[in-house]
Regions:
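Phosphate/NTP-binding elements of NTP-utilizing enzymes
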Residues: 2-216
């Protein structure tokens, strides 16, 4: 019995870790290291002083059970995408659930995954063992981790999104996603997918625009 209990405890501990009751920005400061491609001016350990609103916004949303969806209008230098990637790292480290990240095109998703997400996850101190164990299960658009999967998709067809059961959905550049003539808008499909999870969350962000173009 003791042997079985030890085996089950060891197996579960590979997937589930006790969440640290610390603020988003403090967790990032302890665990995230930014490469020169991610932060040209300030590579190295994450510094919360460089972004005031984004970490606090995600902190309030993720810890508030009264909210299931969050919509953000962001500028190009707001750091929202970076903090969304950091959020993914924390979820993988502390409360693994299936995650889906959607951009308007597959090529953008591939670029984000290869050049930003993978380096950030690989350098995350809280994911050192998890990333090493899962490294053979990685490619540019799909990641298999103990207890969950992480996928990146282009929003070209609703079918790419509709079939994925997810606990955390992130929609980037939602304003650029194609409109569906027959099916529901892809953002609505994402929101429907997270409703299957008791604690599912969906975050969508886009750039504010005026008639002449994007506001920077």
């Amino acid at each position: 019995m003791n042997t079985l209990r030890s085996f089950l405890t060891a197996s579960l501990s590979r997937v589930y870790r006790r969440a640290e009751k610390i603020a988003f920005e403090e967790w990032a400061r302890r665990n995230i290291v930014l490469g020169s491609k991610e932060s040209i001016d300030n590579p190295g350990a994450y510094d919360p002083s460089h972004s005031y609103y984004a970490p606090r916004l995600f902190d309030v949303f993720m810890t508030g059970h009264e909210w299931r969806t969050l919509s953000i209008m962001k500028s190009s230098q707001s750091g929202i995408t970076l903090h969304a990637l950091i959020l993914i790292a924390r979820v993988l480290a502390e409360a693994p659930t299936n995650i889906l990240y959607v951009l308007d095109t597959k090529s953008k998703s591939t670029d984000l995954s290869k050049n930003r997400l993978q380096p950030l996850l690989k350098g995350c101190r809280a994911l050192t063992d998890t990333f090493a164990e899962a490294e053979d299960e990685l490619n540019n658009l799909s990641y298999s981790f103990p207890g969950c999967t992480l996928g990146l998709r282009g929003a070209g067809t609703a079918g790419q999104v509709a079939s994925d059961p997810i606990g955390l959905a992130i929609g980037d550049e939602v304003d650029k996603w194609p409109d569906q003539k027959v099916e529901s808008h892809i953002w609505d499909l994402l929101v429907n997918r997270i409703k299957r999870s008791e604690f599912g969350k969906a975050i969508g962000f886009s750039s504010p625009t005026v008639e002449v173009g994007k506001i920077n």
